[in-house]
């Protein structure tokens, strides 16, 4: 179930303040965050945000297509290495 429309999209205040500060000064630097739950706003476009995946910070460059999605969608938390291969030939 999605978020109620009357509430509007969510973004952590500390992250929004950092983005607004960079937009005012015109700087482009990597912003490190643990806030995977924050929605990407149009003000984020062009910035690189390092999102924590539980082990390291994954740099995510924000483009126009990402607006409306959550930051956590672009930093996967699980690494899939494939299922164990069948060794039918070696068992015989």
UniProtKB/Swiss-Prot annotation:
GO terms for molecular function: rRNA binding; structural constituent of ribosome. Transmembrane segments: none annotated. Pfam families: Ribosomal_S19 (PF00203). GO terms for cellular component: cytoplasm; small ribosomal subunit. Keywords: Ribonucleoprotein, Ribosomal protein, RNA-binding, rRNA-binding. Belongs to the universal ribosomal protein uS19 family. Protein S19 forms a complex with S13 that binds strongly to the 16S ribosomal RNA. This is Small ribosomal subunit protein uS19. It comes from Anoxybacillus flavithermus (strain DSM 21510 / WK1). The lineage of its organism: Bacteria, Bacillati, Bacillota, Bacilli, Bacillales.
